[in-house]
């Protein structure tokens, strides 16, 4: 079964954004990478209902974002992004073009220079046969969209091969573990967390993905978390509205804690890193609202899986992913402890 159609472009109208991103690590050095292809279509100023003090989004555009995270020398951690003309896209097969860079369902090729860095990537992967849908099923229908952002992973855990050249240094990849996700929406959540780990020690094939949001719609709504875990041939999906009641998340600084529940399985975990292992990515919503996203691709994940035994819970597995947790915390306020910024270049 193919998941290619899940990468097809969802939006073309103004007031929307759409992102396709890939995250992965280099097995030999533990370096982490974050590659984003972005379509941004700001709100038409004539229809803007919010105060003029908001940032102007400008005309529709494409953007390329690249970040390298180095756990051995944080001075080598950096991120750069650049604006381009609006993306070109097609279906059958899916293809997205931004500048000279290309993204397909099974490959990413491109280059980006600026801020003292020169980056080139030529990457291929074997597409997944099953996707992860992070949100309740109804939200992916035209009647159930939450009205903020939708997210799914057409390629949640795939073997990636190819090369990345950064400032003249080339790293090669031979079936490294990677994940590719597709996000589309009209605005970011008031606060959110995203996290994934697909390279746990002693758990081949396992992949964990979480999405947590804290929305403000006139009043502050309760925190919501959705969690998906593939482990030992089983798929655990705590992603429906019935799970929200007992699912929990809490995050600040460089740490996220979470728990999720079904009648037979309970999952508890955390992802963490050092402040110097994060970058602040400055986003603009289509309406001009500033958003700040603190991201790392070299965090640590620690997850405990419990199975119900009668009235009690028994620990079944402990999963550890050292320097393999990819996670972020986002919101309207920048975290002052994260000092390194993802830089816009000309």
Regions found by a protein language model. Name each.
Residues 1-346:
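Structured soluble/peripheral alpha/beta segments that form catalytic or ligand/cofactor-binding pockets
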């Amino acid at each position: 079964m193919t998941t290619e159609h899940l990468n097809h472009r969802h939006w073309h109208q103004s007031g929307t954004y759409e992102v396709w991103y890939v995250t992965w690590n280099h097995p030999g050095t533990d370096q982490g990478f974050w590659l984003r292809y972005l379509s941004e279509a700001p709100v038409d100023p004539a229809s803007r209902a919010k105060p003029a003090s908001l940032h102007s989004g400008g005309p529709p555009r494409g953007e390329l974002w690249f970040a390298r995270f180095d756990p051995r020398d944080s001075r080598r951690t950096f991120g750069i992004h650049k604006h381009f003309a609006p993306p070109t896209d097609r279906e059958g097969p899916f293809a997205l073009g931004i500048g000279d860079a290309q993204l397909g369902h099974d490959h990413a090729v491109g280059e980006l220079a600026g801020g003292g860095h020169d980056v080139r990537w030529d990457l291929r992967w074997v597409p997944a046969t099953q996707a992860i849908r992070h949100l309740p099923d109804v939200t992916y229908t035209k009647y159930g969209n939450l009205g903020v952002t939708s997210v799914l992973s057409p390629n949640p855990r795939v073997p990636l091969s190819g090369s990345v050249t950064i400032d003249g240094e080339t790293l090669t990849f031979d079936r490294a573990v990677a994940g590719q996700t597709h996000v589309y929406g009209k605005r970011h959540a008031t606060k959110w967390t995203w996290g994934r780990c697909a390279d746990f020690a002693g758990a081949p094939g396992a992949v964990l993905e979480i999405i947590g949001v804290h929305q403000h719609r006139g009043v502050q709504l309760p925190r919501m978390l959705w969690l998906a875990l593939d482990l030992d041939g089983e798929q655990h999906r705590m992603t429906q509205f019935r799970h929200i009641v007992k699912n929990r998340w809490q995050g600040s600084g460089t740490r996220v804690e979470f728990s999720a529940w079904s009648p037979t399985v309970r999952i508890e975990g955390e992802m963490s890193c050092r402040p110097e292992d994060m970058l602040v990515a400055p986003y603009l919503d289509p309406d001009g609202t500033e958003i700040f996203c603190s991201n790392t691709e070299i965090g640590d994940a620690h997850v405990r899986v419990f199975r119900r035994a009668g009235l009690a819970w028994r620990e079944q597995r402990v999963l550890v992913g050292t320097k393999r947790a990819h996670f972020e915390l986002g919101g309207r306020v920048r975290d002052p402890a994260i000092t390194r910024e993802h830089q816009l270049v000309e």
